[in-house]
Design a protein with these regions (language model features):
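N-terminal and secondary-structure boundary signal
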Residues: 2-304
């Protein structure tokens, strides 16, 4: 990977950063003409520095594991995780040794998945696709900080690892909805945690042990992104970003994604989210909880 393709956020030319300071890599792969599978391969191979898709996937998923794909389907067709991306992830997981019956695509409700174009299935031995309403939630409350929630059984009982598949978009209450906010779909009471622009609630949901220990990777779908009016689908505020964001650090990914959305808002003559009283301060709170880094100097943004 050439140095010309690497951007160290917040660092200046000539700055030598201490070798002991860990950096979180966020790959931003863009090509509006590329197939989802090709763009995914480029992003994954770049993120893990591997020569083949299978090698890349084996860095985060083991063949015998049960893998959950946490999509975002609230906006229906057009504003949800794309079918093409999910199909590409499923294909590569299987090539990396994960059995079809060990893959489950999930979201809050069957109805949401159906509206977004996903084919519901609970068939044994095949890729499953189901809402939390199928298996329900654990009976014991999970608590961290400001949050007390029941966690979806799909996550706790059907997944050894989770690939988080949010969408790159604005959120009318909490500012942005990407890696961190997408995990509201894993709890029974997400509507309770939107006050104060989601701070500290979004961070604390992600700090719940059942969630924190299972998230292996985030692949943020920026094929079509949205800079205003989210989380519902508002085509007048969409733009063809034509890319994917990949990271294992959800805080770093949200930091980069937030910057992308703010840049587009500036281009369109819109006020920054802070002036709209919905700055996503929960990102910094998540960093303080040890969920990742939001310091630009500790984020390696890799454009491919």
């Amino acid at each position: 990977m050439s140095l010309s393709r690497r951007i160290f956020l917040g660092s200046s030319i000539g700055t030598v950063l201490p070798a002991v300071a860990p950096k979180s890599r966020v790959v931003v792969a863009r090509d509006p003409k590329a197939r989802a599978l090709d763009l995914l391969d480029r992003a994954m191979q770049s993120f893990f520095d591997r020569n083949s898709p299978a090698e890349a996937w084996r860095q985060c998923i083991r063949p015998g594991e049960r893998v959950g794909l946490k999509v975002n389907c609230l906006a229906g067709r057009g504003g949800s995780t794309s079918l093409a991306l999910v199909e590409a992830v499923c294909e590569r997981l299987q090539q990396a040794g994960v059995k079809p019956g060990n893959i489950v695509i999930w979201y809050r409700l069957n109805e949401d998945l159906d509206r977004a174009g996903f084919r519901l299935s609970t068939a044994s031995g095949k890729i499953r696709c189901l809402g939390n309403d199928v298996l329900g939630y654990e009976s014991e409350l999970s608590v961290f900080g400001s949050v007390g929630s029941l966690v979806a059984k799909t996550l706790t009982q059907q997944c050894d690892a989770v690939i988080n598949l949010p969408v790159l978009k604005d959120h009318g209450i909490v500012g942005v909805t990407m890696a961190l906010k997408n995990m509201f779909g894993a709890i029974h009471n997400p509507n309770k945690y939107h006050p104060h622009a989601g701070d500290p609630y979004v961070a604390d949901v992600n700090a719940l042990p059942e969630i924190r220990r299972k998230i292996r990777l985030t692949i943020c779908d920026g094929t079509t992104a949205q800079y205003e009016g989210g989380p519902t689908y508002m085509p007048q505020w969409n733009w063809p970003f034509g890319g994917l964001l990949v990271a294992q650090d959800p805080v770093a990914l949200d930091t980069v994604g937030w910057r992308i959305i703010e840049q587009k808002r500036t281009e369109k003559g819109m006020k920054p989210l802070k002036e709209m009283q919905r700055e996503p301060a929960y990102i910094a709170t998540a960093a303080s909880r040890g969920l990742g880094v939001n310091d630009p100097a500790r984020i390696e943004r890799l454009e491919v």
